[in-house]
Curated annotation (Swiss-Prot):
Enzyme class of the recorded protein, top EC level: hydrolase
Record function comment: Murein endopeptidase that cleaves the D-alanyl-meso-2,6-diamino-pimelyl amide bond that connects peptidoglycan strands. Likely plays a role in the removal of murein from the sacculus.
Cofactor, free-text remark: Binds 2 Zn(2+) ions per subunit. Zn(2+) ion 1 is bound in the active site. Zn(2+) ion 2 is bound at the dimer interface by residues from both subunits.
Listed name of the protein: Penicillin-insensitive murein endopeptidase
Subunit comment: Dimer.
UniProt: Zn(2+) 2 binding residues: 147, 150
Disulfide bonds: 44-265, 187-235, 216-223
């Protein structure tokens, strides 16, 4: 499938969630042992943790949206990564969307983030902590040139390279989505230590943040993992294909309704949403 078709499918998957979803009516995590259920783009979570809003190592953006819930493994990853970044004197980690209290489909902006295993992290590390006003209305820093072919040299910093690398080297991380131009710059900067690049995947948009995805927890028996990324650093022909013009004759795919929920997620909705 060419990149234009993939982009249209991704847009449809995201826009399908623009209507209000019943998951928004669940305002607190569902009690129980932590269980991620279903797939990243069609699932839910029982026993989600709340990411502590106050931390010396990170700051949480858009708290009014209440998207700071996730599997305990995700909360621990954020705390682990931000502590590493702080210990290296790199700055404060800016945390974007995680998931809703019970996971599930958003009403816009994300097709995934449904099982408590995804988090968006800004690709900037301020030395001075942001104010409450800045956190509620964050200003993203677009690192990619207008033509989409490379990063903006004056904005690309070694600390951002290190942030992505630290995240990719974490044992629980299975994928990190960034803009193709950012992946390209990582390939140029990586040197001989390249194993971690396999986890960094080019994807549409993602010009100012990275989308980190964790593997399914071993005890979440109904969680559906993705296949591992292809072998290698992903810096060759696959990456270059993202910079090629779309093939002529690409047709817009038909709009699809969301797939049925996993039975456990449907049962959760039936019990907790009137």
């Amino acid at each position: 499938m060419n990149k234009t078709a993939i982009a249209l499918l991704a847009l449809l998957a995201s826009s399908a969630s623009l209507a209000a979803t019943p998951w928004q009516k669940i305002t607190q995590p569902v009690p129980g042992s932590a269980q991620s259920i279903g797939s990243f783009s069609n699932g839910c979570i029982v026993g989600a943790d709340t990411l502590p809003i106050q931390s010396e190592h990170y700051q949480v953006m858009r708290t009014d949206q209440r998207r700071y819930f996730g599997h305990p493994d995700l909360v621990m990853f954020i705390q682990r990564l931000s502590s590493q970044v702080s210990n290296l004197g790199m700055g404060t980690v800016l945390i974007g969307d995680m998931g809703m209290p019970a996971g599930g489909r958003f009403n816009g902006g994300h097709a995934s983030h449904q099982t408590g295993l995804d988090v968006d992290i800004f690709l900037q590390l301020p030395k001075k902590r942001w104010t409450s006003a800045q956190l509620l209305r964050p200003q993203a820093l677009d690192l990619v040139s207008r033509d989409g072919k490379h990063v903006v040299p004056t904005l690309w910093k070694p600390e951002i390279f290190s942030l992505i690398k630290l995240a990719a080297q974490d044992k629980d991380v299975t994928r990190i989505f960034v803009n193709p131009a950012i992946k390209q710059q990582l390939c140029l900067d990586a040197g001989t230590d390249r194993d971690w690049l396999r986890k960094v995947r080019p994807w549409f948009q993602h010009r100012a943040h990275m989308h980190v995805r964790l593997r399914c927890p071993a005890d979440s028996l109904e969680c559906e993992d993705q296949p591992l990324p292809p072998p290698g650093d992903g810096c060759g022909a696959e990456l270059q294909s993202w910079f090629e013009p779309p093939k002529p004759g690409t047709t817009k795919p038909e709009k699809k309704t969301p797939p049925p929920l996993p039975p456990s997620c449907q049962a959760l909705l039936d019990e907790h949403v009137i």
